[in-house]
Amino acid sequence: MRSFRRLLLVAVSGVAVIAGAGLPAVAFAQTPAVSASVDGQPTDPWGQTLSDIPADTAVRFGVLPNGMKYAIMRNATPPSQAALRLRFDAGSLSETDSQKGLAHFLEHMAFNGSNNIPEGEMTKRLERLGLSFGGDTNAFTSFDQTAYLLNLPNTSDEVVETSLFVLRETASELLFDAAAVDAERGVIVGEERTRDVPGLRAAKAQFGFLAPGQRLADRFPIGDLNIIRTAPRDEFVDFYRKYYRPERATMIAVGDFDIDKMEAQIKAAFSNWDNPAPDGPDPVLGEVQPRQTETRIFQEPGVQSSTEILWTKPFVDAPDTSAERAKGWVRSLGMAVLNRRFSELARAENPPFLGAGAGYQDLVNSLEGGSLTVVYNPGEWKRALETAEQEQRRLVQYGVTQAELEREITELRTGLTATVASAATRQTTALAGALLNAANANDVFSTPATDLQIFEATVAGLTVETVNAAVRDAFTGNGPLAFVSTPVPIEGGEAAITAALEASRQVPVAAPVVAATMEWPYTSFGTPTQPSGQTEIADLGTTLITFPNGVKLTVKPTAFTDEQILVTVRAGNGQLGLPSNRPVPTYASSAYSEGGLGKLTRSQLEQVLAGDVVGANFGVGGDSYSLGGTTRPEDFELQMQLLAAYFTDPAWRPEPFALVKSSLPTQLDQVRATPGGAFALASAGLLSSGDRRFGLPSNEEIAAAELSDLRQVVTSSISEGPIEIIIVGDVTIDAAIKAVGDTFGALPARSPATPPSAEGLRRVFPGPTAEPVEIKHNGIATQALGYVAWPTLDSIGDRKEARTVSLLARVLQLRVTDEIREKQGAAYSPGASATSSTVFPDYGYVFVQAEVPPEALSGLFETIDSVTTGLRDTAIEVDELNRARLSAVESLRRSQNQNGYWLGNLTGVHDKPEEIVAIRNAISDLEAVTPADIQRVAQAYLKPDAAWRARVTSANPAAPAAQ
C-alpha cells in the first residue's frame, strides 16, 4: 500500500520544506464484481481483492480475458470531458544492464509511428480532435511503471474511439523504425541535458547512499547516455515484447460518458490484444544492508543546502487493509506533531533552519523508514542538524501531548470531511490520477467517506501512548544515515558531520512546552451595512453589488466544485504605484501574511483556526494588491473576517521579512544553476527595459532592504481607493452580501484613489538586438538556452487582435515543435507563447525559446528565423490552424468550468464593462480567426528587425565535479 503511505506524509506535513529537499519523486469486506470472465491473469489483482476495504462502487473494475485490467468511472466535472490512462507494470527497474533508459525511450517512440499510424501523424490526429501535445497528450516513465495519458475534450464516438485506437496501437503495434529511433535519440539527449541539474545529481548520489547494492540506485529513468545514443533496435523490441503485454496493463477511463458504452468500447479496442512472447521477469531489487551511523556529503555549486536523516528498514509490501491504514494514520499523527514543532522553530527570530519536515516513506519498494529533512542557508548545517536531531529525539523521548494530538486529529478530520463534502465534484483528471496511483501501489480505490470512516475508527479512543509507540518505531532501523547536500565545502568533511550528529545525540532534551490556547478575536469591524446598488449580469450568472462605503462586490455562484468558495480582495494600485528607478522589496510580500495579525501571531492564527478551512494569501499585482483565500460554506463568514482582519490589522512582524532576506540570495543561486532558471530571473527586467518594478534585485540590494519600505508602500496604497471583492463558488448572493456587509462593508468610507501616473503606466519592451544579449547561468557547460521575442500589443484595447496573436503563438508552437524537436532532434521541449498586459498599455510580446547545447545556438536562431519567415510569407493551411485552435478552445471551455477562471476574469468588471464583453467573446473570437488573420499578424509583429534575442550560456568553462 505504497501510495497511501506517501499521501499521508504529504497530508500531515506542517511545514512547507523548500522544493528539492527530501527524497525526490522521480517520474518521468464488499468488493465490486468483476464484469468480465477471466482466462488470462493480470500480474497484480485489484487491491480490493486482498483487502477488507470496499472499493468505490462508482467504479466498474474488470479484467479482459487476455488479462488486461480496466477501471471505468463516470464523472461530470468538467462536463462532456474524459481522461484515459493506459498503465504498464514496468519501468526503469525492469531494464537490463544494456537497456538503461530504454523504458523511457520506448515511451517516446509511442509518438513516432505504429503499424496503422504513420510517423508524425499520431499527435496531429489527436490535435485535430482538440487534444494539445503536452497538455492533453502525454506520458511518463518512472522506476516501476510507464503510463500514457490522454485528456479528451469531449466524449463523442470519434474522440473516444480514436483515442482508444491510439492507445491500442501503443500497446502492441509500435514499429521502432531505425530512422525514427535515430531521430528521437537527440530528443532524449536533449531531455537529459535539460534535466541534468544539481538537484537530480544530488538525488542520484542520495539513492546510491541509501540503497547501496540495490537496483534502485542504478536505474534512474533517464538512463545511460551511451546506451541512449547507441542501443540497437533489438533492445527496444526485447523490452517491448517482454513488458508491454495485456496482463501487465491497466486501462483507466474517467469522464462524462455512459459506463456500459465505454466498457464496450474498451473491449472492442483491446480484447484482440495478445502477446505470445515470454513475460519479462520482475526486477530483483536487492536487500537492505545492516548499517550503523553513516554520513555522505554531496557538494556542488547550485545544489540546495539540506540534510536528510533516515532510519531504514526492509520494505514490507503489506496489503491495503483497514489495519494498515490505521497504522499509517497513527504514525502520521505523531509526525504531524513533530512537523508543527519544526514550523514553530522556523518562524522564530534567528531560526536554526529555513524549514524542516518529518515523515515515513518508502523508496520505490526498496526500503522504508522514518526521515527528517532540514533546509538551511549554506554553511549553517551544524546548528540545523543539531536542532532537528534534538527535536526528533524530544518527540521520541517524551512523546506528544494530549493537546497536540487533539489538534492534529482536528486538522486531519477537517481535510477528510471537506473531501467527503466535495466528492461529487472532483475533477476528472484528479480521479484518473488517483486510480492510476491505486493501480500502481495495488491499493484500494476507496471513497472519501470510507477514508473518513477508517480515520474515525482509528482515532476513537486513541491514546498518546499508542501514537508515541508508533513514532518510536518509525525512528528505528539502520542508521541514522545522514545525507548532506551543500553548494560549498564543509570543513572536516563527512567526519565533521558524523561527529556533530553523535555529539548532538548526547545532549539532554527537555519535555516540550505547549502553547496556551487562544480565541478568535476579530468578529466586529463596525456597523454592518446593506448594499446601495445591485446589478445582475444574467448570461454570466454574475451579480455586481456596491456598498455605501464604496466597496464593490462581484459574486458568481457556481456548482463546479461542491463546498469550495474562492475569495479575492483587491485594493491599491500594485506595480503601477511602485517607483521604476529603485527596487521595493515586494519579493518579500509573504511577510504580510506570515507576519500575522496584531492580536495573533501566525502560529497562534493556525492554532485558533484549526478545524476551519480558511486562508489569507497576500499578492502584488500589476494594478492592485490582493488578499485571497479558499473556504467552504460553513467557514465563509470566518473567511471574510480573516481577510478583513488582515486588511485592517496586519502586524508586519519582522521575522518573516528577515527570513526572506537571509534565504533569498541562496535560493537565487540555486535557480541560476540552470539556463532556464537564469533566464527567468533576468528576463522580467530585461524585457521591461530595466524597469526596477520587474525582475529581482542584487544581493547587495537584498541585504540593504528594509521592512519599513515594503510596509510604507503597501499601506499607503491600500489605504485609499475602492475595495473590490470577487467571490466565486458554492455560495449564495445573500450569504455573500451578509458576510461582506458585516466585514468590509462595515469599514469607514475611503478617499478616492490616486490615479496612476504616466510613468507608472509606462512599461517598455526593449528595442531589437543586433547581437543576442548574453546571460550567464552557473550550471554545466553543455547547457544553453536561446530566446527570441517580438513586441506585440496589450489586452486592454483590441482584445480580439490580442487573441489572434495568442493563436499565432500556438501555431508557432506547432511549427517549432515539428522543426526543432521532431525533425532536428535538437531540443526536448521548445516553446512558444504570447503575453499581453491587461494593465500596461501597448505592452505584449510573442516569444520562442529552446534549450540546446551552446554550439547549437546559432542554428537555433536560424531555425526560428526560418519558421517565422514561413509564417509571414505563406498563409497556413486550415488543418494547421484548426489543430492550434481546437486545443485552445477546448482548454478555454475546460477553464470556464472551474472557479479559478472566473475569479481571475471577473476582476475589474465594475469599472470596465468591456471586460464583460471580453468574457462573452472569448471563444467566438478564437473561432473567427482565419489563416489570413494568422499571416496578417505574423507580418505585423514577427518582423526580423523587431526581434529581441538572448543567449544563456554557462559561466563555467567545464562541468562542475560533484564530490
Outline where the language-model segments fall.
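Non-catalytic, conformational "gating/processing" segments within enzyme and secreted inhibitor domains
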Residues: 173, 178, 185-186, 199, ...
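Alpha-helical scaffold elements lining the catalytic groove of polysaccharide deacetylases
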Residues: 228-232, 236, 702-705, 710, ...
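Hydrophobic, small-residue-rich alpha-helical packing segments that form membrane-like cores
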Residues: 180-194, 198-247, 252-266, 275-280, ...
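Short secondary-structure capping/junction motifs at helix and strand boundaries
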Residues: 174-182, 198, 650-658
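Proteolytic maturation boundary segments
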Residues: 28-72, 258-329, 335-343, 347, ...
